[in-house]
Amino acid sequence: MFNWRRSQLSCLCASTLAVFVMLALNVQGRPANISALKGKQPNSKEDNEILPPDHLNGVKMEMDGHLNKDFHQEVFLGKEMEEFEEDSEPRRNRKKLIEIFTKVDINKDRSVSAKEMQRWIMEKTEEHFQEAVRENKLSFRAVDPDGDGLVTWDEYRVKFLASKGLNEKEVAEKIKNNEELKVDEETQEVLESLKDRWFQADNPPADQLLNEEEFLSFLHPEHSRGMLRYMVKEIVRDLDQDGDGKLTLAEFISLPMGTVENQQAQDIDDDWVRERKKEFEEVIDANHDTIVTMEELEEYMDPMNEHNALNEAKQMIAVADENQNHNLELEEILKYSEYFTGSKLMDYARNVHEEF
């Protein structure tokens, strides 16, 4: 289970392990993503919306293999997460957290059980799913200008390159005439990755066209079992250094390329190793055989897996369960508000029972 109160000794162990990994392996950098291209100034808001997001709300791992550091808040707060991010006033956030507690506490016994938390996690995950569906409708319209409900790879490619600053009409004409497109190496690499992903999202019988549902899977692989499997394969491919299609602990915690130049960078590396080691050993490696298979990683990544939701509920409760009764009381959830919401409530203990 996750331990919110980390010991100082774990830092030393993580440092030692990090050094071992760097010496023992030909360490590869963390997998690349399309963030750099997203950082380029888009021509409009729609331009960024046609790119698959690096971050998937309610999914434990990012598209590039990083752990989702906001996962707990996402599955606890759902669409309310933005409200906590935008409003840093402790008293208002405290009131909102109390309101959430009352909603999670279905039987109104003033405590939250693992089953109640599991149900809540599934509800919040579904909220993220529905938000992705709504956003996808707008994104699909942006790449389907003729409104026929189907998008070809070439149509998408035109919109994508236009979002990178190329003239849309010129690009469309060159593609129509099979002329060479001159783009920088980074853009070409992303195009090739997107093309592979595009055809993976094309459900059988393959027609090289994506409808709105398939386009949703293209942007959000968590909505399709097949695309989730594809995402897992991509992550394993980027981390798997010996090519056996599985992940060892050493491969999973491989550090970024580069020499640690200062203490701050060393601390970042220590956190990287410690967090990934814990997640690998205690959560992802379901049968605890020290190897993570694609099947195990796929189960771990599936946001609608009820067994995962129950385990997550138990882990979240364990973080704040100071009286060890396997339930969460209001006082506990307020005290550990930073874990659940990302916001620290300095006055959590004041008048708890009165406001409740």
UniProtKB/Swiss-Prot annotation:
Residues 92-127, 131-166, 232-262, 272-307, 308-343 form the EF-hand domain. GO terms for molecular function: calcium ion binding. Ca(2+) 3 binds at residues 240, 242, 244, 246, 251. The keyword Signal applies. Ca(2+) 2 binds at residues 144, 146, 148, 155. PROSITE patterns: EF_HAND_1, EF_HAND_2. Its main location: Golgi. Glycans are attached at residue 33. It is found in: Golgi apparatus lumen. Pfam families: EF-hand_5 (PF13202), EF-hand_7 (PF13499). Residues 1-29 form the signal peptide. InterPro entries: CAB45_EFh (IPR027240), EF-hand-dom_pair (IPR011992), EF_Hand_1_Ca_BS (IPR018247), EF_hand_dom (IPR002048). Keywords: Calcium, Glycoprotein, Golgi apparatus, Metal-binding, Repeat, Signal. Coiled coil: none annotated. Ca(2+) 4 binds at residues 321, 323, 325, 327, 332. Ca(2+) 1 binds at residues 105, 107, 109, 111, 116. GO terms for biological process: calcium-ion regulated exocytosis; sprouting angiogenesis. GO terms for cellular component: endoplasmic reticulum; Golgi lumen. Belongs to the CREC family. May regulate calcium-dependent activities in the endoplasmic reticulum lumen or post-ER compartment. This is 45 kDa calcium-binding protein. It comes from Danio rerio (Zebrafish). The gene is sdf4.
